Design a protein with these regions (language model features):
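Class I SAM-dependent methyltransferase SAM-binding "motif I" and its flanking Rossmann-like core
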Residues: 130-174
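A short secondary-structure junction signal
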Residues: 111-112, 141-146, 194-198
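Glycine-rich N-terminal segment of FAD-binding domains in flavoprotein oxidoreductases
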Residues: 26-51
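N-terminal glycine-/serine-/threonine-rich phosphate-binding loop
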Residues: 1-32
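A glycine- and small-aliphatic-rich helix-loop capping segment at beta-alpha/alpha-beta transitions
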Residues: 46-56, 81, 145-153, 201
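Glycine-rich beta-strand-to-loop/alpha-helix junction loops that act as flexible
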Residues: 34-39, 132-136, 187
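Ligand-binding beta-strand-loop-alpha-helix segment within the catalytic cores
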Residues: 56-128
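ATP/nucleoside-binding phosphotransfer catalytic cores, i.e., glycine-rich phosphate-binding loops
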Residues: 180-232
């Protein structure tokens, strides 16, 4: 497990924000996939403020999501809605650079539409950077233990939360693994035990998608705060 430990969650998201600045200076479109969850909210708030809001050339960055819940963008559960509220409403970014999963649509129709958009915009299926979180059960995006097909050749999949039954659309494991770079952003002592397990046990012996999904031809790294890394 290739990991970097930061003193706090804030210092981890500052590092990611600094890298957004660097990515945005490339003179070509850069495709970044975002994650939902509490730590990414910290990232979006940080990006919306000085110095990052002005230092980033937003027109070069295209944003996607690892997954989203099938709810309206105004619903508090919407991953896209959180980013809109915390970041997009505060910066000048072209509307065509935002590639959201339309959670208000019927799931099967939206799956088809989203896959078509992915194919049209990123024809080789290779994202520049995919930022992922990890749940306490080891899920990532909406790829859950014991129900993820790691061989699924599609670009996206309809997933169902194992407890709530809520529908989501998620990138598939295979699409994520094509990325040039995958960064798992994991914070808080609630994740310490599972991180220790991932570090000490071969991925094939674990049920956790976050342990198994790694960039095939790129870099996979874990950004952890001190609390999450305390058992490593």
């Amino acid at each position: 497990m290739n990991y970097i430990t930061f003193p706090t969650a804030q210092s981890a998201v500052e590092k990611i924000a600094q890298e957004f600045v660097i990515y945005s200076q490339a003179n070509h479109p850069v495709h970044i996939s975002l994650s939902g969850g509490s730590t990414p909210k910290l990232l979006f708030k940080t990006l919306a403020q000085a110095p990052y809001a002005d230092a980033i050339n937003w027109k070069n960055l295209h944003f996607w999501w690892g997954d989203d819940r099938m709810v309206s963008p105004t619903d508090p559960e919407s991953n896209y809605g959180e980013v809109q509220k915390l970041l997009f409403d505060h910066i000048n970014i072209p509307a065509e650079n935002i590639h959201r999963i339309r959670g208000e649509n019927e799931p099967h129709l939206e799956l088809k539409r989203f896959e078509e958009e992915l194919s049209a915009v990123i024809s080789d299926g290779v994202f520049d950077w995919i930022i992922l979180g990890m749940g306490a059960d080891g899920h990532t995006a909406s790829l859950f233990p014991n129900q993820t097909n790691f061989a699924d050749e599609n670009l996206a999949v309809i997933a169902k939360h194992p407890e709530s039954g809520q529908f989501r659309i998620s990138k598939t494991a295979k699409l994520i693994e094509q990325a040039k770079r995958i960064t798992y952003l994991v914070t808080g002592e609630g994740k310490a035990e599972i991180l220790k397990e991932i570090q000490t046990t071969p991925a094939e012996n674990l049920p956790y998608p976050a342990a198994k999904i790694q960039a095939k031809n790129g870099v996979t790294e874990w950004y952890l705060d001190k609390a999450a890394a305390k058992l490593l």
